[in-house]
Amino acid sequence: MSTYPYRRILLVVDLTEDSLQIGRRARDLAATLGAELELLHVVEFVPVEPMGETLMPAVRIEDELLVRARQRLTALAAELGLPGAPHRVESGNVKAEVVRVARERQVDLIVLGSRERHGLSILVNFTEDTVLHAAPCDVLAVRVGKAAPG
C-alpha cells in the first residue's frame, strides 16, 4: 500500500484526441505514487421527448453511443499500457456522474483535462470547473489544447 495521500486516482476522459495526453499524465502519476488508476467516460444524452416512433431510434442511438464509448475507452486503456485497469462508461450528467463515481469508489484524486478559454467561452460553465467545486477529493486539471477564440 502506498504511503502517499493519493491511493485511488480516477481518470476522467472525453475520448477526444486530448485523452491520451491526460491519460499519460494520470498513468505516470499513479505509477510514481503506487496508486490504483480507474478510467471513466460519461456519455451525456440530449433529452428526447417521447413521441411514439421517434423514441425508439433515440434509444437505439444511445445504446450505440454507449457501445462505441466502451470500445474507445478500452482502446485508450490499451494504448496507455493499462489493459487490466478498471474502466467504465456511465451515462448522465457529466459532473454528477464524475462526483458520484468518485464518492462510490472513494477516490483520492480526480484527473481530467482543462482547455484554455477565450472570449465568450469564459462565460460557459465547463465540466472541469463544476467538478472542481463539487468533488469530494482533490482535482488535477491537465492543461490541453487551445480553445478557439471567440
Residue spans for each PLM region:
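Short secondary-structure boundary segments
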Residues: H41, G113-R115, R143-V144
